[in-house]
């Protein structure tokens, strides 16, 4: 898994969005919760949301997310320098407008592949899935792999009422964590193909 972090002066390193080392689980209740989470993703056609991202070093950023399942996601970071993350079924494109450059990575090497797949499987082959119940009706589903493609930990955090995704967290193999908390979520609104278009920079 790859992580996007803000340095000073502001600069986003590649590709992340997202947290938490979990311990303990309840196998029976956990299986039910995982199925409920998979059903939640299956029922999402489109989503728009604001987000706040916090990195391990305490740096923060805000922006907007547009998702059209399956496969399509755009994450736009506010502030300077501008940064956009845009997915296709195969690629994660990192658009840096200030440098007039797009860099592309296989989506399978990022945690985004797990939540953009059709269907979503939160117990994929080769991964360990652990469920943890937290205070206030919060449920965390951690999907972990020690090595190889997609190594690291993705944690999805759901509220109980309504049951929906509120935060995701990524921890890479070096232990660097990034969390993204969603706000002002809206579902089922039109999302056109143009929202996921890539710029045509010279010499690309």
Question: Whereabouts are the PLM-identified features?
Answer:
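N-terminal secretory signal peptides that target proteins for export/translocation
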Residues: 1-9
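Sec-dependent signal peptide recognition
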Residues: 11-18
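N-terminal signal peptide c-region/cleavage motif recognized by signal peptidases
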Residues: 24-26
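Boundary at the C-terminal end of the N-terminal hydrophobic targeting segment
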Residues: 28-31
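A short, Trp-centered hydrophobic/proline-enriched beta-strand micro-motif
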Residues: 39-58
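Short hydrophobic/aromatic-rich beta-strand segments that constitute the beta-sheet cores
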Residues: 51, 73-77, 92-95, 143, ...
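An acidic-aromatic
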Residues: 62-114, 178-179
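Gly/Pro-enriched, hydrophobic low-complexity segments
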Residues: 123-204
């Amino acid at each position: 898994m790859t992580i996007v972090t803000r340095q000073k002066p502001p600069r986003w390193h590649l590709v992340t969005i997202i947290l938490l080392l979990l311990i303990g689980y309840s196998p029976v209740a956990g299986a039910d919760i995982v199925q409920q989470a998979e059903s939640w993703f299956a029922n999402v056609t489109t989503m728009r949301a604001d987000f706040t991202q916090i990195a391990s070093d305490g740096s923060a950023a805000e922006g907007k997310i547009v998702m059209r399942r399956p496969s399509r996601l755009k994450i736009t970071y506010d502030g300077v320098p501008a940064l956009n993350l845009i997915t296709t079924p195969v690629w994660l494109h990192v658009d840096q407008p200030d440098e007039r450059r797009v860099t592309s990575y296989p989506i399978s090497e990022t945690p985004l592949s797990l939540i953009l797949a059709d269907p979503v499987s939160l117990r994929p082959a080769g991964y360990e899935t652990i469920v943890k119940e937290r205070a206030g009706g919060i449920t965390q589903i951690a999907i972990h792999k020690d090595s190889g493609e997609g190594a690291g930990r993705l944690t999805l955090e759901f509220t109980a009422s309504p049951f929906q995704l509120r935060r995701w967290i990524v921890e890479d193999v070096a232990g660097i964590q990034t969390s993204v908390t969603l706000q002002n979520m809206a579902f089922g609104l039109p999302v056109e193909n143009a929202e996921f278009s890539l710029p045509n920079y010279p010499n690309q």
